Amino acid sequence: RDFGPSGLRDGQYALDLVADEAALGVLRRAGVGVLSEESGFEVGAAGTGEVVVIDPIDGSTNAARGVPWFATAQCLVDAHGPAAALVVNQASGVRYWAVRGEGAWCDGVRLQGSGCREVGESIVGLNGLPPRPLGYRQSRVFGAVALDLCLVAAGVLDGYVDCVDPPAHGVWDYLASVLICHEAGVVTTELHGDDLVTLDHTSRRTVLAAATPELLESLVAARRP
């Protein structure tokens, strides 16, 4: 395993490229389209219009530094939107998955959000540092948004707030986990009102999630300038 820089762009590691090539080999054989962080967009040979949005390694810096919190995240998108999702913690083997309309699961256990409504009682995952106190009881910064959002779906965290400006997350970072959140009863939004579902490789989003609409409203209000 090569955790050194790829030399192609900042923040990309050789491991990212190896994982991407391995994933592309499987997805090409399936005939689906692919939107990958590392290699961009490919039209699927099967002609179904289905696209798998994939981040081969989310949390590459964690992987490079030996922090056991990094994942492969995949989301199948069809004409109706996100249809199926899989997020695998590559350090521990823990798997989160969801199918549209059928619920979300972690290694066979059905997921459900915590139900927290009050921001003052919440434990919230963060990306970056908040510009001001957001009112939560405690916060955690783990460094892999795909897994962080799955913790909200599992009820481990009550919410998630991306504090980085300008928007920095590509759709591959969050889309699989957003479907998992929705199937677990967790609500999500984009800070600036943009659609979280996009197949534009250049688009970036600011993602928030919460166990309940009440908590999400409080977090969005606190996060906005």
Where would I find each of the regions flagged by the language model?
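N-terminal subdomain of lithium-sensitive/metallo-dependent phosphomonoesterases centered on the IMPase/IPPase/PAP
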Residues: 1-57, 215
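Acidic active-site catalytic centers that drive phospho-/nucleotidyl reactions
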Residues: 16, 55-58, 89, 148, ...
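Residue-level signal for inorganic ion chemistry
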Residues: 16, 60, 89, 98, ...
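An extended, acidic
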Residues: 29, 101, 111-225
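General beta-strand structural signal in soluble alpha/beta enzymes
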Residues: 33-38, 54, 63, 140-143, ...
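Anionic group-transfer/hydrolysis microenvironments
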Residues: 39, 57, 91, 164, ...
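DPxDG-like acidic metal-binding loop motif
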Residues: 47-101
